[in-house]
Amino acid sequence: MSAAIYLVKGREKSVVRRHPWIFSRGIDRVEGNPQLGETVDVYGHDGKWLAKAAYSPESQIRARVWSFEKQDVNRAFFVKRIQDAQLLREDVIERDGLTGYRLIAAESDGMPGVTIDRYQNFFVCQLLSAGAEHQKQNIVDALIEVFPDCNVYERSDVSVRKKEGLQETTGVLHGEMPPKSVVIEENGVKISVDIVGGHKTGFYLDQRDSRQQAMKYVKDKEVLNCFSYTGGFGLYALKGGAKRVINADVSQPALDTAKFNAELNEFDISKKRAVFLNADVFKLLREYRDQGTKFDVVIMDPPKFAESKAQLNGACRGYKDINMLAMQILKPGGTLLTYSCSGLMDQVLFQKIIADAAVDAGRSVKFVERFEQAADHPTDTAYPEGFYLKGFACKVL
């Protein structure tokens, strides 16, 4: 008989509504001696069976639901999950000509704590929960069954694993070591990805739709691409006919890759058309403001400022500061494309921050378009936390 957890009376509601998280305060008792990541049965206070979940004794999220059906959590289970996820994405893969996409979006694909990104034939896994770690071999075996020629690499070098009682880890799980550059394609744009050393799993796949939508704002414009990383938005700006694009980032290796990506797409990278500037964006924005340098379009896609609720207030100040500075260096009628990937900051709060930035900048600002994560990053209706990326196109008058 498997181990089991019984919920506090009244705590069943979220599970009945199929939310996949069960917090420690919602558990009345544990029967058996479940180990880190082990699958347990979940029961209501009345003894009614509710779900199969992975047990995590060191996390505030004490259990994460694998299934709301009575089924074994084994290789066959993950094969079905992966097949369903691939089928869900077939339309967008064909529509956008993708050779890089998110295959598994954790809880939203019924695999809590599991992220799998595909770059050509390299599948990059981030296993962020005790249950994901416990099921690692089943997940890898399932990938091999669905994609027989795949290579699987792990990028679980994420600090959140510590909350689950896990160490950070990386390495080959199956097949070959990824090369320094794996070239993917999206919307006809070629992008070199460093799976082993790049941010996240190598690239920001979630911004693909926003990159495409940005093109309509840049034709014949002077564009400043802040926190450019390997040039994603800058590439689309060049494709969209921008007069000039300045890509600014603090990482020289990222800028070198951005330049390589521009060359890969055969874009004009003369200094009249494309600049790759190693700079602290906060300092750079202030320098441009003080010098009176103006742009037609500013793209503001910073890294996550808030990893926890304790950091949220500081993150709000950071977002307001950079957006205020961006508004101050825009020409009248210019466009600010601004984004936040902090899940703790919802769209309403982000919109308020932009409004506060407009007041501090002394500019009249209009929201003209809203953005969210790309279609291969779905959000399950029972798991609103899966919606994390939000953005706005703003006209700055």
From Swiss-Prot:
The UniProt record lists the keyword Thylakoid: no
Superkingdom of the organism of origin: Bacteria
Occurrences of domain PUA (ranges): 2-80
SUPFAM superfamilies: PUA domain-like (SSF88697), S-adenosyl-L-methionine-dependent methyltransferases (SSF53335)
Keyword NADP: no
PROSITE patterns per UniProt: PUA
Enzyme's top EC category: transferase
Molecular function terms from GO: RNA binding; rRNA (cytosine) methyltransferase activity
Database matches in InterPro entries: PUA, PUA-like_sf, PUA_sf, RLMI, RlmI-like_PUA, SAM-dep_methyl-trfase, SAM-dependent_MTases_sf
Role, per record: Specifically methylates the cytosine at position 1962 (m5C1962) of 23S rRNA.
HAMAP family noted in UniProt: 23SrRNA_methyltr_I (MF_01857)
PANTHER family linked: RIBOSOMAL RNA LARGE SUBUNIT METHYLTRANSFERASE, S-ADENOSYLMETHIONINE-DEPENDENT METHYLTRANSFERASE DOMAIN-CONTAINING PROTEIN
Stated name of the protein: Ribosomal RNA large subunit methyltransferase I
Gene assigned in the entry: rlmI
